Amino acid sequence: AAIASGFAIEIDLQLSRDGIPVVFHDYELDRLTESSGLIADLDADELESIVLIGGKRCIPRFDNFMEYVAGRVPVLVELKDQDGALGDKITALEGAACEVLRKYKGPVAVMSFNPNMIARCAMLAPEIPRGLVLDAFSETDWPKVSDTRRKELAAVTHYSNVGATFVSHSYSELHSEKIIELKKSGALIFCWTIRSKAQSKQAKRFVDSVTFEGYLPDDIR
């Protein structure tokens, strides 16, 4: 539906047990499928057989998904932090994702809450545009992250270091001084997740584009 309408697509990547990136938002299967357990505990072949709730589609491998899109619309790829600590632990996800991205012919960008993952993408696939995903980094949402680290991330201190050109910020905190500063400096500002035309209208006073679900917007911006 997104491709037919000309909308860009935002996807999330997790890593299977055998080191293959798959398109899935959650760390656990329970909310979005009839199965249960961790994505990381299953091989990609097993995940590809798990049906998503509300349809006949299964969890796709990243490379197969990108082959299907084939450059018809832009794709925004979020690398999910793999340990919840937003630290500097190197995972196989960055390398596996960048291997696919380097071969892809079409508009694409990569982003993450974890700036260390984006820094590694800068080394592995420097030609791919990069960005940071942001929110308030509260202790409630990020219980495994130290207070010092959360404050550092909220201040967006890594934006220039990783060569970012955009941020994607939570809708509820778009009015922060840091976002205003970034926009003035030339950064593209996206936001997530918009769930109505009313929210979209309000958000677009501040942002360049929105990640949306549950409704069809009047334009593709």
Model-derived regions: residue spans:
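Catalytic domains of carbohydrate-active enzymes, especially glycoside hydrolases
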Residues: 1-15, 161-165
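Anion (oxyanion) recognition and catalysis
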Residues: 3, 102, 122, 183-184, ...
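Active-site flanking residues adjacent to catalytic metal/cofactor-binding acidic residues
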Residues: 9-11, 24-25, 77, 212
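Short, glycine/acidic-enriched loop or turn micro-motifs at the edges of active sites
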Residues: 13-15, 28-29, 81, 196
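Metal-dependent phosphodiesterase/phospholipase catalytic core, i.e.
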Residues: 25-137, 160-165, 169-171
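C-terminal active-site rim and adjoining tail of enzyme catalytic domains
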Residues: 133, 141-221
